[in-house]
Structures are given as C-alpha cells and as structure tokens.
C-alpha cells in the first residue's frame, strides 16, 4: 500500500483537544495523486506520484501519461519508496532490476488514484519533506550562528565577520564545505515526529500537528513513519 502522498502547504492554525489543550497545526491540501510509474529497487518499490494540474507538459511526460492510461497533465512528479520485504530498511545498498516480491508489491498499480483517505487516519505518525523558505544572501552570523568578533580592543568592523578561513596547510587553501556567507534557505528539509490530527477526504484536506517546512503553497511530501 502507498505510504505517502503529495500536497500543498496552505496555512498554519491551532486546534484544541478534548481537555482544552491548544496544539499548533498545519493545514495541507493533499491529493488526489495518480500513480504514474512503479520501479523496483531490491527490497523497495519506487512509486511515482503525479499531483496538480498544468497547461503544458513535455513530450516525454505526455508519453509517460499515455502509457499509464492517464488523461492528466500533472504539475509535480515525485517518487515515494515503499518497503516490499518485511526486513527492508532505509539504509544499505539496493539492486536495480530485482524481480518484485509479488505481482503488486506496492499495493497499487499504474493508473490508480490515491486520496488522503486511502493513506492516512487520525493519529498516524508522519514525516514531512519540503523546501525551506529562502532567506537570500546571509552572513555567517545569521546563516551558521557564528559568534562574530569582539566589539572593542581596537576592532572597528569585525563584529559580524567570519574571521580566518585558512587551515594552516601547505599549500594554503580553503577546505571544501567551509562555512561561509552565501545564499540561505531553499534546502530540502524533513521534519519527523509529526502526527495526523484530522483527515477530510471530501475536500482533500490533512490537518497535521506541528509545523512543516516551506512557505505557503509550497510542495510537500507526507509519508507515514514505518
């Protein structure tokens, strides 16, 4: 069975439990999604989901949709990996082209429609993957939480400077990955430990306890914690 779905982050709100406790929630417009392809990777099946609509798609995507028997022009295409073996795990190596464990190891077939009611129920633990908000060009204090230099003792413009970037090597060079100023944000972020509060299959709405990465109307991937 498919363990995830694609959605659009809509808004952040709050709700109250039966005992009056306030909890922050995120409202997500999720699905319906269409299964556009299924690939097999050893102990995993990669289920490609299409979501949203657009006016034009590439010729290659048109051929893929025709092969899947779908009269759709999805805006997004993303793959979700599903374990097909009881001892499957997310680490280690996998072999491409390994025969499937069963005729339909992913619990679905190409052309199927997936809705929030098919995947989630209130109380399910989930993880959400999205693209974090872009912050533009940022210095090391904001981007990497550097302490900065001293404000006094003869210093005039060192308060938010990165300091030395040398490594006392011969020949002298800057190591790859050195934390420096640059563009901040727009990173792929996964938040774990979230929980489904409510499912509205009629309106394709998920309410998730906690905050999810990204800005409003950003694409997110919601997956069950297995």
Question: Where would I find each of the regions flagged by the language model?
Answer:
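Extended basic (Lys/Arg/His-rich) segments that typically form rRNA-contacting surfaces
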Residues: 1-226
